């Protein structure tokens, strides 16, 4: 049976202490009181499950698909017909400025200490609680930068704490690092969950993700190389622990994303399980018979040729006139991710793509024509944390450390990370080599003519590897943010993100192509968003979200000050 689908509902029923019930002199008979609940490890485990749907969303539920595929399109990978845009105004309320999950984690950590368990169990569950607190604070810092830090359950009358000023993001992330270090030391190495519960490797995997983000943010935004090195070392160490565990390996690329069951998949550290009639999603449907937001020309051109060279210098590249040429002799991950034998054009196909290039990374062909392959009935399992990400986290952290004066990136580093990805069964792309600090393939040093001149050549190739390996998995916007490269999503300065496949209308006689805009009239590259104002990046304030007005007013009304983010 499924492990945690309904646990959030169970926890809501059990966590009575979020409600006011002081008016009752006699404890309620139909539910636990706080004092009675925290008596067994089983109850602790049940409470912990309440965190899972919030942090391990997978493909979401119903008519959603989480951050996968087009769940996050404000980046340079997608060519939507109506492009997502940066926040333009300070919200009146909401906006993600909430500390409810911090409070929940602090309550959990506090109560675990009171449960009659042995010390190993107390330390394990404390580590689990500190993982969730760390993840929540990472999310808050990611969105807002400086935030008030709380590591204890607060009284509702302690205004000096409730309305405290924002703490510096470095102070907060140092606390988050302490949480992850404790969790890595104390969370159990093995739990009988087959990838459905938090264990030490899950902690380490998230640690590599969180501190790769924060280390690069400190480098590119805060100009703090010492703190950048500390966090990047933490990311590298965590990834290396997972690698050295020997517990994970790579199999078929696409099976990680379109399988009815991920149980036993050697690449998956943590996944969310789906079952018809219990918990389903709609991601498979939007890779199946529905119109979809397609990948940009820029994204398609980021895939290497099969000789391991960028298309701008590879003799293997056949050009972009026709899908057969675009897809010839490419990094095989392009075939695992995108439909390679046809363009899907608006006016020709009912399941058209806005760019002509269609995605099938998440499509399970076995259920494509069954009821569960359509609508919001999709039961394919969702990877939450996978080994492929851990490998590229290791490579990027190591390469970034080298730019900060750390140890040089070695061939051994590449062979235990990037080249494991390239030697995945069914991929078999030539190894990436480092020669004199520069990228090389088969002994040939090269420099991509499309490289951003601000980015060193080797780091450019590792970032490319990350983009390709994690394509459409919801990472790209945060990657551009932490690298301080949001200019890549500017449709004026980077028009190829608002371009799709090359099309000649004469190739589609009788088709109604009136909704198809092309760069050269009756032929040219598809323009997914031909009308309206193009998306631009013209203000660095959007690297952080604004704090909602109601929170600033609330602080002021209580006699305190909550500072707004710069530029808002």
PLM regions: where:
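Conserved, well-structured interaction surfaces
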Residues: 41-57, 75-144, 160-174, 178-195, ...
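Short coil/turn linking the two alpha-helices of tandem helical-hairpin repeats
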Residues: 141-142, 146-148, 191, 213-222, ...
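Bacterial Sec-dependent N-terminal signal peptides
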Residues: 1-29
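Amphipathic alpha-helical protein-interaction segments enriched in hydrophobic
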Residues: 196-210, 382-390, 475-481, 485
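Long, intrinsically disordered, low-complexity segments
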Residues: 19-20, 98-101, 175, 260-309, ...
